[in-house]
Structure formats: C-alpha cells, structure tokens
Amino acid sequence: MAANMYRVGDYVYFENSSSNPYLVRRIEELNKTANGNVEAKVVCLFRRRDISSSLNSLADSNAREFEEESKQPGVSEQQRHQLKHRELFLSRQFESLPATHIRGKCSVTLLNETDILSQYLEKEDCFFYSLVFDPVQKTLLADQGEIRVGCKYQAEIPDRLVEGESDNRNQQKMEMKVWDPDNPLTDRQIDQFLVVARAVGTFARALDCSSSIRQPSLHMSAAAASRDITLFHAMDTLQRNGYDLAKAMSTLVPQGGPVLCRDEMEEWSASEAMLFEEALEKYGKDFNDIRQDFLPWKSLASIVQFYYMWKTTDRYIQQKRLKAAEADSKLKQVYIPTYTKPNPNQIISVGSKPGMNGAGFQKGLTCESCHTTQSAQWYAWGPPNMQCRLCASCWIYWKKYGGLKTPTQLEGATRGTTEPHSRGHLSRPEAQSLSPYTTSANRAKLLAKNRQTFLLQTTKLTRLARRMCRDLLQPRRAARRPYAPINANAIKAECSIRLPKAAKTPLKIHPLVRLPLATIVKDLVAQAPLKPKTPRGTKTPINRNQLSQNRGLGGIMVKRAYETMAGAGVPFSANGRPLASGIRSSSQPAAKRQKLNPADAPNPVVFVATKDTRALRKALTHLEMRRAARRPNLPLKVKPTLIAVRPPVPLPAPSHPASTNEPIVLED
C-alpha cells in the first residue's frame, strides 16, 4: 500500500513510451481534472542521453574535477559506465503528466563531496545530480554555490593593539559616521523632527505628478512618506547639520521645493511588479535568475530591496493566504495501483504456449547487454531491422537507467572504450553502421556521399611551404594519398624557421610558354589519324522470296516465325533494356527509367568556348555538326583554309502580303 502511495515531493518514474526508458520526475502538485482524472505537475530531470555531446563532455570534465577534489576510490570501466546512467541533470522546466503513467518511486540526491560514487551502484533506483540543465539555453550550471577559501577572499586581521597604543590608520577612509548617540538633542525633539520630515514628504508627493497618480489618496501618500527611506534621510540631515534643528529644517525644504525621497517600492512600475511576482512564482528566491530572465534592467540590490519591501505589503499577505487555501484544497497524495499490462515489446515465439514468453528462442541470438541465452522473457530492443533483444533483467535496467549494463557497439562505442556514447545520439543509419550485425555492403552504402565541386584557394604561406618544405611535405606522395592526414602545424613551424634563410636566395621561377589555343587546335587537326577503312567483302545476295516460303507450316505460324526472327516479339523499355518476362508493353505504360547512383555520377565538365572554336563551328555545316555530335570519339577533319570568319549573311527583308479588301474566313 505504501509503495503505491505517491505524495508531493516524491521522485517517480513516468512512462511515456513502451520502447523508451522511464522519465525521472519530481511531483510538485497533484491536481484533479474535470473528468475526475489526476494530473501531476512535475519538475523535469534529464539523463545524459537527453543532452548534446558537447554538454556530455562538459559533464565529464566536471566529474573528473569532483573525483580529484574528493579523492574518490578507483572504479572499473564498467562501473564508470554505469555511474553515467545514475547521473541526472536538474532543470526548472515543468510539465503536466497523467498520474496513471507513474511506474514507481526512485531517490534523487544532490551530490556531496563526502559521498562515494560507488555506493550509488549498490542501491536500487538511486540517482544523483550536481548540475542544472537549461533546455532553452542548452547550458549546464552548478546547482550549489562554492566557498571561496584563501588569502584572496579572506580579510587580513591586524594584530591586537596594546593598551594605550594609538591607531595610526585613517579612520575617515575606513568608515563614515552616520549617527552620534551622544548628540545634544533629546528623544522628544528627534521624534518631532521625524514627524515634520514625514509631513514634508507627504507634501512633496502631493506636488509631484507621477506620485499623485500612483498614490491618489492622502492616506496612501502619508503611508509612502512614512517608510524608512524618509526617516533615514531625516536622521542623516540632522547628522550633517550638527544636530541643529533650524538648519536641518531649512535643508528639508530648500528654495526649489520640498525634498522627495523614494524607495524601490515607489520606483518600480506596476508592470515591473507583476513581472517580479511571476518570476518569484517560477524561480523562488533565486534573484540572479529573476534578474537574468525577467528584469535585466534592474540591479541585483534593487531586486533584493524590492523583495523585502514587497513582503510588507497587503498583496503578499493576500497571496500567502490564497496559496495556503489552495494547498489545503489540493491533493496531498494519490494511490496508483501496480501496472500489470504486458509490454508490447515482449517477443512471443511462434509455436509457444499462450502466456509463455521466449519459449522457442532462436539459437545464436543473445542478450545485447549480458550476452545470456536463457531468459524467462525477451524484449525487442533497438531498430526493428536489427533484431536485437534484451533479457528480463537487462530490460528492467534499460527502462530505469536509460542504458545497458555494458557498453555495446549499438550504443555508439566499441567494447572496452572508456567513454561510450548514448545510442540516442545516433541516427538509424549510424547505429546500423556501428552494429556488428551489419554487413560491409550496407556500410559501404551508408558511407557513400554525393560528389560536390569545391575550390581550394591557398594562401601565400602555403605556396611557400610547398617549395621550402618539400622534403617534409612530399607533395607527389601526398597527391597520391589525398585522404592521409598532414601535420600542418609541424610544417608551418618548420616553414617559419626556414623562411628567414630562404629570403636571401630567391626562388627561380621558370615561366611556361603556352601556345595560343588556335595553334594547338591546328596541330591537333593535322596530327589526327585517318579513319581506318573496314574491309568489305562481296555482298551476299538476299532471296526476298525466301521469307515467304511455307516450309510446311501454316500462314500464321510463318508470320510468328518471321516476327521472332526480326526481333519484333522482344519489347524494349524506355532506357533501351528489354522488359522482363510477363510484362506487356502495349497495355502498360513504359518502364521507369533507372536512376544513377549518386556515387557513380560523373564529375561536372565545363567547356569554355573561344573565338577560334566559334570560328570552327561556323566553318562546319549543320550536317557535319550533327554527324560529329553523334560520333564524338572520332577525329573531325577541318581544312585550315576554311577557318575564317565568314561575312555576315544579310537577312532577307520580310515580305508583307498585299492588303486585300476580301474578308478573311476561318474554317473549323
């Protein structure tokens, strides 16, 4: 009974999907809906698999610092892997979930420097947290403050003075006297002066337009003038005027008008006060977060002062009473029976008895976590095409802690690695490529990428390094191995060392004499080999009446034999390949063209035309151009004398038909 009773403040497991791990949440409120169901307002806690890899590395560095400072005992790699499943990240994100999705209780504690990490592995359903995750900003912050110890943060305590020894320090620089208790005024005179100061403050608010809007009544103005800011200013005025009441009175009411003193309660507008109440409802008394997210234009001191003044108002008292009444009306606890429905991921073997799970388990397939071959129940785990499964104990571990007991390749790490990554960070193709059950052919398909055209633009220092550090760079060898890495930092350092010495002997540049394109084209045309003539024998006479002979068969059979010989009975598809047997091309549309594999697509070729090539085009007739396009592998014979710019052919003048007065008739 007590195990199924859940109260406000409990850490519980929530199940949002049958194939995903449980969600760890803290119950903040239990509300009853109009339908009679119970909803739980919970605080979200995140696992390592829920955050990015960069934040995981940040959490790893924080864990290493904690182990060094607290001098944790050494743990094995498997224990370190399981400790990452016990670490959670607190957040300030709230959500509402049905109470019927609760699957059990757990314990979450703040990591203390006196804790031993290995103790968390000995306890069931036990987690810890030390960092706070912000789902919006994607940041990790420490949840607790730090004690600054050292001479940099502590004050230096001077030695005690001997009796009769004077203090040679300048007291005016160290402190300022704001009130003298041995003043000549009596307590009655001081109280009368404070009453006058309140009256001056009330009169000043009546003259001020903005104050008259905020405090429309005399009672509200008098209450605002009676706050501590007015009394502190009056007492400071007495101290500065040597406790002379006449001088102090004239200071309160100068020539320009009475002095108006305002505190944070009057400086803040109504909208800013509403923002503060909303932030206080969300963050509590975390003034740094309130200032950062809601009131960035206010100083931290201003927010703290407003908070303690706001607690003295009637609005705070009313809200406190309303919250107490709501807390009394809300549910304090809820009873959720144990969830007994079977999980959809259970594997029911073919031929097994009803109610038995895993009876006919296939040989050769083991648990992905503990590699056992026998279990009372088996559960499908991972992508469906992988056919991975877990035993009953490993499935419960996966649901509670969001990982496997041992790091596997499907989780994103090789067995024995020190830092396995969560499988939740991998897509399905990546998980398949890392799985031991994926064939090499499938991996090759996954690694295939589309070819992209790129431009490599080098700097002057890189071009110098090619010549000065040729022995280290080995450009010819590197060109044959474009995927082998090159230590650019070492070559850059060596180039900077050799650069001062090489400046004395400048490099000799041998310019290449490049012939014009027209000359190269003429040489290619002259050197083009002649097309070899194929030997042609005597033509075999064809007996045209041979096909029409009967040869002992009927007319219909002769026609079919002729169609078979001529090839008319073999239909061809749109891409030139014969259709498969059983497909009729006459009654069905043409077959779909085959698509090229992106990895087999040819590289783009760009042909830049010049004046000479354009002249060659003009020297050819339209028929020769089409013949050359059909046979691009054969050389093209062009007479050099024909390479000349032909005079432009005058266009014939358009002939306009003579206008007639006869009507134009359009026939359908």
Curated annotation (Swiss-Prot):
- Subcellular locations according to the entry: Nucleus
Q: Per the record, GO CC terms? A: chromatin; chromosome, telomeric region; histone deacetylase complex; membrane; nucleoplasm; nucleus; NuRD complex; protein-containing complex
Q: Where are the zinc fingers (GATA-type)?
A: 367-394
Any single biological process term in GO: positive regulation of DNA-templated transcription
What keywords were assigned to this record? Acetylation, DNA-binding, Isopeptide bond, Metal-binding, Nucleus, Phosphoprotein, Ubl conjugation, Zinc, Zinc-finger
User: Molecular function (GO) terms listed?
Assistant: chromatin binding; histone deacetylase activity; histone deacetylase binding; RNA polymerase II-specific DNA-binding transcription factor binding; sequence-specific DNA binding; transcription coactivator activity; transcription corepressor activity; zinc ion binding
Q: Where in the sequence does UniProt note compositional bias of the Polar residues kind?
A: 409-419
Region entry Disordered, spans: 409-437, 580-599, 647-668
For this chain, the site of the Glycyl lysine isopeptide (Lys-Gly) (interchain with G-Cter in SUMO2 and SUMO3) cross-link is 492
Q: Which residues carry this modification: Phosphoserine?
A: 52, 54, 433, 435, 548
* Residues in cross-link Glycyl lysine isopeptide (Lys-Gly) (interchain with G-Cter in SUMO2): 492, 508, 559, 595
Q: Which residues carry this modification: Phosphothreonine?
A: 534
Q: Where is the SANT domain?
A: 263-315
The organs and tissues expressing this protein are described as: Widely expressed.
Concerning its family, UniProt says: Belongs to the metastasis-associated protein family.
The annotated subunit structure for this chain is: Component of the nucleosome remodeling and deacetylase (NuRD) repressor complex, composed of core proteins MTA1, MTA2, MTA3, RBBP4, RBBP7, HDAC1, HDAC2, MBD2, MBD3, and peripherally associated proteins CDK2AP1, CDK2AP2, GATAD2A, GATAD2B, CHD3, CHD4 and CHD5. The exact stoichiometry of the NuRD complex is unknown, and some subunits such as MBD2 and MBD3, GATAD2A and GATAD2B, and CHD3, CHD4 and CHD5 define mutually exclusive NuRD complexes. Interacts with CHD3. Interacts with CHD4. Interacts with GATAD2A. Interacts with HDAC7. Interacts with MBD3. Interacts with p53/TP53. Interacts with MINT.
Q: What does this protein do?
A: May function as a transcriptional coregulator. Acts as a component of the histone deacetylase NuRD complex which participates in the remodeling of chromatin.
> How is this protein named in the record?
Metastasis-associated protein MTA2
- Gene name in the database record: MTA2
